[in-house]
Amino acid sequence: MSDAIQRVGVVGAGQMGSGIAEVSARAGVEVTVFEPAEALITAGRNRIVKSLERAVSAGKVTERERDRALGLLTFTTDLNDLSDRQLVIEAVVEDEAVKSEIFAELDRVVTDPDAVLASNTSSIPIMKVAAATKQPQRVLGLHFFNPVPVLPLVELVRTLVTDEAAAARTEEFASTVLGKQVVRCSDRSGFVVNALLVPYLLSAIRMVEAGFATVEDVDKAVVAGLSHPMGPLRLSDLVGLDTLKLIADKMFEEFKEPHYGPPPLLLRMVEAGQLGKKSGRGFYTY
């Protein structure tokens, strides 16, 4: 078994990938981030720089620590540049076919036999992407939460064939190096958090759809009555209604249970491009 993880690769520099890269670099780890296009690399780098600047302004990171983190980040459009990584975390679009193709390529490219290949998927069973590799025993789920620099939880998902040494090594990295709280769970769609969260969000949408209560009153009831920091409909907007639908679709496909099924109102809003905060309009206007 190789030494402690010091070289990390991240596939995808979107909201999640850039956050994972940032927290890894802030922890003193050498990080290589892959995106297939220079424009995506520029966007990802800018996202990380802005996040670090906010952290400096908030007094959470010194300017020296910011500069050190940025110095540990490398960006590439060549997947082969991840060949020497000890841990590669995939954080691309929530599409099984796309993820499977990436894992097949990573399995070919990453040469260290002890290297771990991890997916940040929030809903796809890990075995589905592990099956695309010739070494599924080194594949596991490592699901971070948005925003990655702020939320402390990581779900670590073992499949039926994941090597325990790989899981233990990854857990040590996430907890000791990144300072995350790790929850282990078995390989089923939604894992722990989304299996609880998604039915709750969909139930709130159904309540509004049925005219039982307004968007504002549903959120007010949860915030004022349950001390949640945010109501379910505003949270749905933050997650992204298209993302919520994708996760719900995957969970309904796996479990065939009605409470995982996306309600018609959610479907219509996604079709109309009302995706929540990122599009400027969802249950609220931004």
From Swiss-Prot:
Activity regulation behaviour: Activated by magnesium and calcium, and inhibited by zinc, nickel and cobalt.
Keyword NADP: yes
Catalyzed chemical reaction(s): 3-hydroxybutanoyl-CoA + NAD(+) = acetoacetyl-CoA + NADH + H(+); (3S)-3-hydroxybutanoyl-CoA + NADP(+) = acetoacetyl-CoA + NADPH + H(+)
Pfam families reported for this sequence: 3HCDH, 3HCDH_N
InterPro entries assigned to the protein according to its UniProt record, in alphabetical order: 3-OHacyl-CoA_DH, 3-OHacyl-CoA_DH_NAD-bd, 3HC_DH_C, 6-PGluconate_DH-like_C_sf, 6PGD_dom2, NAD(P)-bd_dom_sf
Entry keyword NADP: yes
Thermoactivity: Optimum temperature is 37 degrees Celsius.
Single biological process term from Gene Ontology: fatty acid beta-oxidation
Pathway: Lipid metabolism; butanoate metabolism
pH dependence: Optimum pH is 10.
Induction: Up-regulated upon acid shock and SDS stress.
Outcome when changing S122A: Loss of fatty acyl dehydrogenase activity
This protein's GO CC annotations: cytosol; peptidoglycan-based cell wall; plasma membrane
Site annotation Important for catalytic activity: residues: H143
Record keywords, A-Z: Fatty acid metabolism, Lipid metabolism, NADP, Oxidoreductase
Domain of life: Bacteria
EC number(s) given by UniProt: 1.1.1.157
Molecular-function GO term, any one: NAD+ binding
Function per UniProt: Catalyzes the NAD-dependent oxidation of beta-hydroxybutyryl-CoA to acetoacetyl-CoA in vitro at pH 10. Also catalyzes the reverse reaction albeit in a lower pH range of 5.5-6.5. The reverse reaction is able to use NADPH as well as NADH.
Family: Belongs to the 3-hydroxyacyl-CoA dehydrogenase family.
The protein's name in its UniProt record: 3-hydroxybutyryl-CoA dehydrogenase
Source organism per UniProt: Mycobacterium tuberculosis (strain ATCC 25618 / H37Rv)
Gene: fadB2
